[in-house]
Amino acid sequence: MQQADLIKRIQELKVKRNAVILSHYYSRPEVQDIADFVGDSLALSQEAVRQDADVIVFCGVHFMGESAAILSPKKTVLLPEIDSTCPMADMVDVEGLKRLKEKHPEAPVVSYVNSSAAIKAESYICCTSANAVEVVNSLDVDEVIFVPDKNLAAYVASRTDKKIIPWEGHCPTHHQILREDVLKMKEKHPLAKFIAHPECRPDVLELADHVASTRGMIMYAKNSPAREFIIGTECGLIHGLHKAAPEKTYYCISEFACCPSMKMVNLEKLLASLEKMQHVVTVPEEVRVRAKEALDRMLAVKVK
């Protein structure tokens, strides 16, 4: 089927199913273009709650679909590619987290939304890269357990007086972005601003002109007087950057800055999910209720 025919059929089924399509910025360009809403993890969580559709088709990885199912239990949540798991989310396990909690009984668990529903259920509050600092600083404690990303934990630790007890996880895509990659790109494009995601290594963030979530990176590039930008995150964001500020130039930091899991969803799989209503994301109710408490606490935190 030609792309135009795929798009037409998806649009028809979307109306028939009363469905809404949500996509992360790291998805394929054609998937972002057909989505009703494209955003970062925080915005997508908020949008899942706002939408009054019967069906949410989540173009992203498994934990994103789970978050939508947790927050909107009466809606049917579809994940076009059921095997699109997040490697970082898989780096933390429930039993290991329970043992860490036993070692630090006074420290609440702050879980990055890039985690499974089971991990969220073991957490006091969730966070995203857009609100991690505000979430941690909102807690009236001296120390927190932060899972699963050690790089985001280090970024938060540099912006709070609280002791951060990190889990030893990381995003493989961001962790592969090296300091020498940045220095080479800066030498090649001396006028370009380097904007980076806080999942990057600390020594990479030291070189950044601005550190932000994907949405924050887009807003910075759009509002900056600079004309060129080196992009320190998954290169799918460049599509969103071009749409927000097409007159500017963007350079992908590295050929390795590509998340295979985020690229698994394509138009064919999106169509199949709507046609067959397949790959429904479900979360056991006992887990869902506990995980929702952590997500609700996050959504109540005010972000500057």
Curated annotation (Swiss-Prot):
Compartments where found: Cytoplasm
Protein name (database record): Quinolinate synthase 1
EC numbers on record: 2.5.1.72
Function: Catalyzes the condensation of iminoaspartate with dihydroxyacetone phosphate to form quinolinate.
Family: Belongs to the quinolinate synthase family. Type 2 subfamily.
Bound cofactor: record note: Binds 1 [4Fe-4S] cluster per subunit.
Catalyzed chemical reaction(s): iminosuccinate + dihydroxyacetone phosphate = quinolinate + phosphate + 2 H2O + H(+)
Main location: cytoplasm
Residue numbers binding [4Fe-4S] cluster: 86, 171, 259
Chain sites annotated for binding iminosuccinate: 24, 41, 112-114, 129, 197-199, 214
HAMAP family (alphabetical): NadA_type2
Entry cofactors: [4Fe-4S] cluster
Domain of life: Archaea
Pathway: Cofactor biosynthesis; NAD(+) biosynthesis; quinolinate from iminoaspartate: step 1/1
Pfam family, one: NadA
Gene name of the encoded protein: nadA1
UniProt keyword annotation of DNA damage present: no
Annotated organism of origin: Methanosarcina acetivorans (strain ATCC 35395 / DSM 2834 / JCM 12185 / C2A)
GO cellular component: cytoplasm
Cited NCBIfam families: nadA (TIGR00550), PRK09375.1-2 (NF006878), PRK09375.1-4 (NF006879)
Keyword Heme: no
Keywords carried by this UniProt record: 4Fe-4S, Cytoplasm, Iron, Iron-sulfur, Metal-binding, Pyridine nucleotide biosynthesis, Transferase
Uppermost EC category: transferase
GO BP terms in the entry: 'de novo' NAD biosynthetic process from L-aspartate
GO molecular function: 4 iron, 4 sulfur cluster binding; metal ion binding; quinolinate synthetase A activity
